[in-house]
């Protein structure tokens, strides 16, 4: 049992930036990319296992014909607000509809470990935005794992936030690949012909020489940590990005701290308005975007 090939399929803009989350790119682009991935996954390079974000369920119909254990999902939300699993283009999978894993590196380790029984070969596909792909990029660099990089490069900016991809995560050389025609009446049918389709192989860098690693180990204990800044720095890693509503309001406590007029802890009442201003109501993560 083992992974013979890893392919990362994602979107890029002209500045080599990924959409930070799935909701930061057009759902029509994801629909096209997932269909391309399903067609490419039929190549005879091992059993295909496609990892995608949970919030692409409505756009992942081409993948649902795969066996359940070969189409795992990752819930990439970093918010504490309740998920939207019923409505909207970016609704998530229902419970038990798909196998859930922690992240793409966890899926790779699960497939690559030794197990008793017949030896099976897998082709791992990672399809998504920066919140899904970047943790795998970091894992691949740490473990010196090479992978195929398949991207659709658009001419337009993302609907939401971009995440610039460091050069170490990009292939040094790329060639073009020809996508299969878009489905009839696709919203981006005219634009898809203007996009670039890049394919390359990301090769891990050479290991540091043993002498250099030894010197680093000697100097590391004597490095003084920098004083902490008084201003909190915003989280820039794509896996730590909350939704826009969460970023615009203070953290909501888990339990209400108000009491009723009778001070009955078993029957807390609703928060009272101060003047003409009502307290903020609870919200649901629901990314709104346009096709």
Curated annotation (Swiss-Prot):
It comes from the Viruses. GO terms for cellular component: host cell cytoplasm; host cell nucleus; host cell surface; virion component. Residues 223-281 are annotated as: Disordered. The modification N-acetylglycine is found at residue 2. Keywords: Acetylation, Activation of host NF-kappa-B by virus, Host cytoplasm, Host nucleus, Host-virus interaction, Virion. The keyword Membrane does not apply. Pfam families: US2. GO terms for biological process: symbiont-mediated activation of host NF-kappaB cascade. The keyword Acetylation applies. Plays a role in the activation of the host NF-kappa-B pathway by interacting with and thus activating the component MAP3K7. Belongs to the herpesviridae HHV-1 US2 protein family. Interacts with host KRT18. Interacts with host MAP3K7; this interaction induces host NF-kappa-B pathway. This is Protein US2.
